[in-house]
Amino acid sequence: MGDVDVVALRSVSLTIRGGELLVILGASGSGKSTLLNILGGLDVPSTGTVSFRGTDLTHATDAKLTAFRRKSVGFVFQFYNIIPSLTALENVKLVTDIADDPMDAREALQLVGLEDRMHHFPSQMSGGEQQRVAIARAIAKKPDVLLCDEPTGALDYSTGVKVLDVIEHVHRQLDATVALITHNAGIADMADRVIKMRSGEIVEEYTNATRKTPAELIW
């Protein structure tokens, strides 16, 4: 049998507005993670174009995509990807030591409420605290865009709300552009704008008249 082509995204057209908090909502397999990977320069589309502030990334070299990710994009994933043998501060310094114009690693940890835990190792921290270290690491290089892929997916409700509160705080304090993907419809209420995906397509887009705080979310 021959190879079977699987289309992950179909006719997707999306503009992320500077300074907004965008939630991309969809079930597993809807294409939202693929879209986020393309937006972050981790993958390139087989057709269509991707641009960032007027610069075409569609046919960029690996070196240019690496530079784009390193300078302009902060990533937060469902699993924290922090190094167990390093303290919270040392994990954040992995980024600040190579970034062009980073904030101080201690400042990043203070922004996420871990000023008293910065010398702790991951094994001494809860799941929510480890995710906050991951957020601090992502924002420490002062990215133009923060991309969050199911940041509460491995957390219970109360811990998830705390992590969303940190993301909301970072969004407001740094005037950051945030795109957060989730399968959790309750999280959509904290967004400026919501994109719903199904089977690789955008099926709905709307703007929230008022945004809820993470503490007001129910799921």
Predicted feature residues:
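Conserved beta-strand-loop-alpha-helix hinge in the C-terminal portion
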Residues: 201-219
